[in-house]
Regions:
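Residue-level detector of anion-binding/catalytic polar loops
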Residues: 22-24, 132, 163
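General beta-strand structural signal in soluble alpha/beta enzymes
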Residues: 27-29, 74, 135, 164-167
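A conserved beta-strand/loop element that lines the FAD pocket in flavoprotein oxidoreductases
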Residues: 158-170
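Conserved N-terminal/central alpha/beta ligand/cofactor-binding core
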Residues: 33-37, 41-160
Length: 171
């Protein structure tokens, strides 16, 4: 049983399927399937405080379905994971996760690997200011593509036999 169909729940289900394909999986999610989530703010121009749950943050893929979907592909940004598990292993996990996103339809184009004289000059100025300019490759999904990508994952999980119980809150 997996509680929540946000990123942690989704990737847990994917890993169980890969390593124990015969294992029965039930995902319990208090929100809706990704293809049934529509924020009324797009039509009204203001937050309607959806009840019982916000359509932006709750449902399959969590807030990721409505984000612009930027995936940072370097261990050098984003938190303490490299300190906790080591830089090499952190990068290995980032690459592994990125590969999964590609399998489900992420654009192969990566931005953020910029070089050239202008970047070298900015890097020098950053060093003089006590800062570090980090080249960070970014895979940009885009809001529309993120929703389709998560729908692809949702459909895949269901095809693999994952039972999904939506609109169900756990106490």
């Amino acid at each position: 049983i997996i509680i929540g169909a946000g990123p942690a729940g989704i990737f847990t289900a994917l890993e169980v399927i890969r390593h124990k394909p015969d294992q029965k999986i039930l995902m319990v999610e208090k929100g809706k399937p990704v293809d049934k989530r529509h924020c009324p703010k797009a039509e009204t121009g203001k937050c309607m405080n959806c009840k019982p749950n916000c359509m932006i943050t709750t449902g399959f893929s969590g807030a990721g379905a409505f984000s612009d979907g930027k995936l940072s592909l370097s261990y050098e940004v984003g938190g303490d994971l490299p300190t906790l598990i080591g830089e090499d292993f952190a990068q290995e996990l980032i690459n592994y996760t990125d590969k999964i996103y590609l399998e489900f339809g992420a654009d192969e184009h990566v931005e953020g690997n910029y070089e050239g004289e202008e970047i070298k000059e900015i890097r020098k100025r950053a060093i003089r200011a006590g800062l570090q300019l980090v080249n960070c490759p970014i895979r940009h999904l885009g809001t529309e593509k993120a929703q389709q990508l998560y729908l692809n994952i949702q459909n895949y999980l269901q095809e693999k036999g994952v039972e999904m119980l939506f609109n169900t809150e756990c106490d």
